[in-house]
Structure formats: structure tokens, C-alpha cells
Swiss-Prot record:
ATP binds at R224, D225, E226, Q233, E488, G540, L541, D542, R543. Aspartyl-tRNA synthetase with relaxed tRNA specificity since it is able to aspartylate not only its cognate tRNA(Asp) but also tRNA(Asn). Reaction proceeds in two steps: L-aspartate is first activated by ATP to form Asp-AMP and then transferred to the acceptor end of tRNA(Asp/Asn). It comes from Rippkaea orientalis (strain PCC 8801 / RF-1) (Cyanothece sp. (strain PCC 8801)). L-aspartate binds at E178, R224, H458, R495. This is Aspartate--tRNA(Asp/Asn) ligase. GO terms for molecular function: aspartate-tRNA ligase activity; aspartate-tRNA(Asn) ligase activity; ATP binding; nucleic acid binding. The gene is aspS. Keywords: Aminoacyl-tRNA synthetase, ATP-binding, Cytoplasm, Ligase, Nucleotide-binding, Protein biosynthesis. It is found in: Cytoplasm. SUPFAM superfamilies: Class II aaRS and biotin synthetases (SSF55681), GAD domain-like (SSF55261), Nucleic acid-binding proteins (SSF50249). HAMAP family: Asp_tRNA_synth_type1.
């Protein structure tokens, strides 16, 4: 029976006899004495087998190799002063092995080095194919432990301090497509009919509020068939919450308590409260996006009113057609950003054009407020307009002003992208800093140009601001997102709980009443039986843990993730299935593999 985990042994355990299990991380032979680094999920401890002091274990120690699985019984001893290792928590002690029992060996060559003391860069596809080995590595083991600690902290706060109940909602449900594509599951018992895997528990958690559950949470598995990127997976996990009889302010404050509890529990950090807040409109104005990284400045400045009547048509036409002209001021930019980088072929030019801009206009502020700029600006802006630009941006000698002009969306996207790139390149972003803020008052709807209709910016169950009910098309939503260092980690809203308002929202996004009742009739009927006011929020667990772990991809905080092609390299899923299975489901595939010529 195991008495201790490897990484838990300390000087206070000296003279104890312990039983350990684990993997051989490294084996070294120094002058006839064998040293073994024994590893389990908690860390490493040094094992010593000496032919003089521990003759019974020595023959077995000689046979050990990396990643052999062993049981070791031995006595905890103080390390000699010259071999103390302050780099590991167990560095004051070592175990003299009385016995070593080999439980299992390694019969094939390891695809990569696992030892935490011999760092090796391994291609991600190899790591994913041998994920069970990758997860033995110290970094990955710590990421999984951090994930567990975050979930544990969530549960303790919600259950012990806020009286939430954990309730499971169905995984097999009906398809109500709104946004990403559903994963569909054919029903054998009901031929021709299909389940969908849930994109979120949204409707069920609202029904739980109708049921009087009052405060619900769930560590929920969700599924979306969408194009993937570094922070997306086809199946992902979220902390899902819903609360009755709470105002938006009360929900935000409760969630600030939750987030602060998580940081204190897993990082021992005290996060100041209340968190800063920005409306959606203000975030777009100052940063060009609704999830700004506020660890650094470089705020955008709207100068549309100054240049709307200028002779420079790029500026004046942008404003006349309903667009914007904004400036990204870069203090000291004359020294750090060359013209080569701004002009075609340069990295900043490329960043801007990839975001939709046609190019970058600029002004360099020289001594005595003299301006170095492109001819079109120099010749077509009056002296007063130039001085107004300097005054509004606060620019001084040595500063660089980068312009975005055009439709508002493109200007915001391009300058927001440049802001992040320049902020990182100039070392303005402190990686140790933690900035959390709420974004509030989102628009209810956005225009879908492909389908030529309005669609819900969040989802169609979000409650509109009561002040805006007379004109839903331009209404603000009672919605809120939590942004952590420029990454959205949570989002929620107050919900519609009145049938007539829900019907109006469905109509606004182009759903006929027949279609609305076909898809959501069960929800609309529930609203006729005394539905309480309610609201909620969901946190992307994978994304939150990724940030807390300092990783760049959520794949590094998920035990068995999919690739960006939505495949599992370990199990080779997805895969074809037996024709018999398809016949039982009365499903036929029309897919034909492409020929080489195609």
C-alpha cells in the first residue's frame, strides 16, 4: 500500500519508512551508487541504491530504465549538503531503497523523451498521437492538476457559499440551429429523426428556473461543428450558471466573487473588486474590439469630425459614407517603427490589409510640431486641422500617428490588430499583469449580410434593455462578457421570461411564428406557467485554464483534444463505421472520396 506520493516528501518525513509507486524518470550510476529519479503526478523524489547500505535493492536497481513502473520501499534520509537540490520541492531528502519491485517495463522505443529534467521540443502531432505519454510530462501533468483545482474552486464557491445546485442537462436533445452547426445523431428507435448534441445547456437551464431550482450550475460538455483555431475545439467544457430573482448588478457581483475565489485558490492572488466596466460602444471606440487587452495603452482616437471636410478624399469620403477615421497614436513610434514596415511589403501593412484595410496613412511628429507625412495629407489638411489632430491625440515630438479610414468595422478591426501587434513588439504588455473587466450593453442584434437579416449578437433569449423595447432592432441587450487580458472567458445576460417579448425577438430575427413554435414551442409554453425573472453566464473552462496556465492553446489544458481538423490522432476518430450499423440507423452516406485527378 502506498504511504506517500513522490512529490509530497519533505524534511519532516526524515527517518520514516515509505512505500512509493511511480515511473523511472532518470537513472544514474555514480561510482557504483545508483540514483533513480522516481516520478508520479505530484513530482520527483531521488531514490538511492547503494551496494553497501541497501544490498537487497541493488541488483534490481541495475536493471531499471526510463519509464519502467516500480514499487519502492525505503527510508527517508537527509541529503548531504553538496547534493541539496533547491530546484525541486523534495530537494532536501532522498530515499534509500530497501526493496525495488518492477511492476512493468518498456518494450518499445519511446517516441520522445518524457523526463522533466531533459526538455525536448516535440512536434504536436507526435504528442497527440502518444497523448498518454505526453500527459506524463511535468508541464502537462501540472496543467491537468490546475484544471482540476479550478473546477474544485468553482464547485466550492458556488455550492458552499452561494447555495447553487449542480444539475445535469441532456446531451441528446433536438436541433435548434442558431449560430454554429449542430453535431447530429440519428435515432435508431425513430427512423428518419435526429438528435443534436448541445451547443450549450441554454434552454434547459432556463427551464430549470421555470421549475423553481433558483440557482443552477453545471460543468457542461458542449459541441459545435465549426471551423477551429487555437482556442476552439469541437467539444469543449464550460461552467454554466443560471440564477432567478437577481438583477444584472447582483449577477456581476456574485461572479466577481467567484472569479476572485478561483484566483485566490489556484494562484494565491487577491484580485481587486469591483472589476472595471466598459460599455460595448466605449470598448469599440477606444480599442476597436469588444474584448480589449487593457494591460497597456495605445487607445484609438476618433478624428472623424476633424477631417470630415478635409481635401483628402480618403478621409472625407469615409465620413460621408457613414464610416470613421481613427488614429492609433504610438508614443516614440518614430524611433521604433520605420516607413518600410508601414508601406506595402511591410509587416504592419500586411497586418492591416489582412484585417480589410487598403493601407496605412501616417503622420510622424518632428521637432517643433513639424509633420512628416504622405503628400496627400500634407497638401489636403489645413494647418488648423493638423494642429487639432495633435491636440486630440496628445502627440508630441517623436510620436507616430497611424490612421484607419473607411467603414467602421474595417477601421476597428485593422487598428485593433495593429494595436496588439505593436503593443507586443514594443514590450508594452506585462505578461504577469492580470486585467479583468466587464463589457456591458451589447447591441441586441447584428446584420447578417449573407442571409440579409438581423441575427442575435449573443443568442435570441437575451433580454433587451427595458428602455429600448419600443425599437428592438436598435435595442441594447442586458448582456455582459468577462474579458481577461484581451480574451473573452465568460459571457451571459438577463433572459427574456415573458412570452410576448420572446415572440417579438423571434420575429425580429426573421422567424415566423410557425417556425418559432416548431423549434421553441416547449419554451414558449413554459413561459405561460409563471416564469421568474432570471439570468446567467457561462465560462469557457478550457480557455480560462489556458490563461491561468500561461499556455497558448487550449489543446495543452485538455486531456485528449482534437486537432484543428477536428480529428483525434490517438484513436483516429472520426472513422468509418460498419455498413450494418448504418443500415440499423437507416442512414446512407453519399460521400465519394475525391480521385487524384480531382
Amino acid at each position: 500500500m502506498r504511504t506517500h506520493y513522490c512529490g509530497d516528501l519533505r524534511a519532516t518525513d526524515i527517518e520514516q519508512t515509505v512505500t512509493l509507486f511511480g515511473w523511472v524518470d532518470r537513472r544514474r550510476d555514480h561510482g557504483g551508487v545508483i540514483f533513480i529519479d522516481l516520478r508520479d503526478r505530484t513530482g520527483i523524489v531521488q531514490i538511492v541504491s547503494d551496494p553497501q547500505r541497501t544490498p537487497d535493492s541493488y541488483p534490481d536497481a541495475e536493471t531499471l530504465r526510463n519509464e519502467y513502473v516500480v514499487k519502492i520501499v525505503g527510508r527517508v534520509s537527509q541529503r548531504p549538503p553538496e547534493s541539496l537540490n533547491p530546484k525541486i520541492p523534495t530537494g532536501e531528502v532522498e530515499i534509500y531503497a530497501n526493496s525495488i519491485e518492477l511492476l512493468n517495463g518498456v518494450n518499445k522505443q519511446l517516441p520522445f523523451v518524457i523526463s522533466s529534467l531533459e526538455a525536448e521540443l516535440v512536434r504536436e502531432d507526435v504528442r497527440l498521437k502518444y497523448r498518454y505519454l505526453d500527459l506524463r510530462r511535468d508541464r502537462m501533468a501540472k496543467n491537468l492538476q490546475l484544471r482540476h483545482a479550478v473546477v474544485k474552486a468553482m464547485r466550492r464557491y458556488l455550492e458552499d457559499e452561494q447555495q447553487f445546485m449542480e444539475i445535469e442537462t441532456p446531451i441528446l436533445t433536438r436541433s435548434t440551429p442558431e449560430g454554429a452547426r449542430d453535431y447530429l445523431v440519428p435515432s435508431r428507435a425513430n427512423p428518419g429523426q435526429w438528435y443534436a448534441l448541445p451547443q450549450s445547456p441554454q434552454l434547459f437551464k432556463q427551464l430549470l428556473m421555470v421549475a423553481g431550482c433558483d440557482r443552477y450550475y453545471q460543468i457542461a460538455r458542449c459541441f459545435r461543428d465549426e471551423d477551429l483555431r487555437a482556442d476552439r475545439q469541437p467539444e469543449f467544457t464550460q461552467l454554466d450558471m443560471e440564477m432567478s430573482f437577481m438583477s444584472e448588478e447582483e449577477i456581476l457581483r456574485l461572479n466577481e466573487g467567484l472569479v476572485c475565489h478561483i484566483f485566490k485558490s489556484v494562484k494565491n492572488l487577491d484580485i481587486p473588486r469591483p472589476f472595471p466596466r466598459l460599455t460595448y460602444a466605449k470598448a469599440m471606440e477606444k480599442y476597436g474590439n469588444d474584448r480589449p487587452d487593457t494591460r497597456f495603452g495605445l487607445e484609438l482616437v476618433d478624428v472623424s469630425d476633424i477631417v470630415k471636410d478635409s481635401g483628402f478624399k480618403v478621409f472625407s469620403e469615409a465620413v460621408k459614407t457613414g464610416g470613421k477615421v481613427k488614429i492609433l497614436p504610438v508614443p516614440g513610434g518614430n524611433e521604433t517603427i520605420s516607413n518600410v514596415r508601414i508601406k506595402p511589403g511591410g509587416d504592419l501593412f500586411r497586418e492591416a490589409t489582412e484585417a480589410g484595410a487598403k493601407g496605412i496613412a501616417y503622420i510622424r511628429v518632428k521637432e517643433d510640431n513639424k509633420l512628416d507625412t504622405i503628400g496627400a495629407i500634407k497638401d489636403n489638411l489645413t494647418e488648423d486641422q493638423k494642429l487639432e489632430l495633435l491636440a486630440r491625440t496628445g502627440a508630441k515630438s517623436g510620436d507616430l500617428l497611424l490612421f484607419g479610414a473607411g467603414d467602421t468595422d474595417t477601421v476597428n478591426k485593422s487598428l485593433s490588430r495593429l494595436r496588439l501587434v505593436i503593443g507586443e513588439q514594443l514590450g508594452l504588455i506585462d505578461p504577469e499583469k492580470i486585467n479583468l473587466l466587464w463589457i456591458t450593453e451589447f447591441p441586441m442584434f447584428e446584420w447578417n449580410a449573407d442571409e440579409k437579416r438581423l441575427e442575435a449578437l449573443h443568442h435570441p433569449f437575451t433580454a433587451p434593455n427595458p428602455e429600448d423595447l419600443d425599437d428592438l432592432k436598435t435595442a441594447r441587450a442586458q448582456a455582459y462578457d468577462l474579458v481577461y487580458n484581451g480574451v473573452e472567458v465568460g459571457g451571459g445576460s438577463l433572459r427574456i421570461y415573458q412570452k410576448d417579448v420572446q415572440e417579438k425577438v423571434f420575429a425580429t430575427i426573421g422567424l415566423s411564428m410557425e417556425e418559432a413554435y416548431n423549434k421553441f414551442g416547449f419554451l414558449l409554453e413554459a413561459f405561460e406557467y409563471g416564469t421568474p425573472p432570471h439570468g446567467g453566464i457561462a465560462y469557457g473552462l478550457d480557455r480560462l485554464v489556458m490563461l491561468l496556465a500561461g499556455e497558448d492553446s487550449i489543446r495543452d489544458v485538455i486531456a485528449f483534444p482534437k486537432t484543428q481538423q477536428a480529428s483525434c490522432l490517438l484513436t483516429e476518430a472520426p472513422a468509418t463505421v460498419d455498413e450494418k450499423q448504418l443500415k440499423e440507423l437507416q442512414v446512407k452516406s453519399t460521400y465519394k472520396p475525391k480521385t487524384k485527378e480531382e
